[in-house]
Amino acid sequence: MTKVLSEFGFSPRLYHISAIDDFEYSSIRRENELRRWLHYYIESGIPVAIGLGSVEGNESGHSMVCIGHGKAKDTLKNQAYRNRWISWENRNQAHPIINSADFYEDYVVVDDNQPVYQVRSFDNLSLYPNMRVENLAVPLYKRMFLDAPDATSTIRSLLNDERLGLNVWAKDCLHEGESVVVRMFMASSRSYKAFRAKTLSGVLVKELYTLIPMPRFIWVCELYRIGDYDNLMAFGEIVIDATSAPNRSHQSLILMHYPKLIAYREPDQNEAGFSKMAELQSDQLIPGYRRNLDEITLE
């Protein structure tokens, strides 16, 4: 599969469940983390080839393609709240992070053994019994150097940084210890800028999103209060460079938008900080980005 993707000009990333480290002191399993990575790419509008293997390991495998996801479920939200992530270093003052990818378990698949566009649970994607997801093959463009695991690591580090974290930048809009829901996805900067310019109000903020230099591809982390996620109205967002090398960490940061403030870095800036900041007149919420996937109602 990866060879075919390479021949079509992609730079495929292959993820195998056995390569994921165990989570100490956590109820999150390897399967959960692999599903999160799948969700980030699907939320980015990128189709993912899925390889399934037998749970017992004594039967042949199977493959399919995932192209979408189902709706968030309240039962999964309750579980996600219990699985929220807290930085050990800042455990006494951190804002717990809830991963919105944990709100979903249903995915739209194309499988030669099923009618097209079936919505199946991640734990039962195949019609064959006792099959589990073991690997993912993701067709990234050659200039997308920062993949989902590295982007997640960078965002987590930024959210808990002593200079750039939530405790500093969101202290005026969050209560002490308030949980934050994060939504991660990749987008083209052109589409992202156009969406922000169309959906935000205010001349200054529209102009800033239009003029801020960005690479062709970006990772976006939208930040939500728990009660605002269902309506996809974020209080803030972080944008990092999807074409950046993984070892650049905070130097891949492009933009942070919080109530009444936008800060961004120039492309030639080496240090992990901001060269430009702009104060906004209002603290309007940010509409969640909706251009990667189309919502389809099944009748």
Listing of model-derived features with the role each one plays in the protein:
Residues I86-S191:
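Conserved catalytic-core surface of thiol
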Residues V181, K193, V220-C221, D241:
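A broad detector of the eukaryotic-type serine/threonine protein kinase catalytic domain
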Residues M1-S26, K142-F145, P149-L208, I212, ...:
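Catalytic-core signature of thiol
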Residues M1-S121, F217, L223-L298:
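Conserved active-site-adjacent core of cysteine acyl-enzyme catalytic domains
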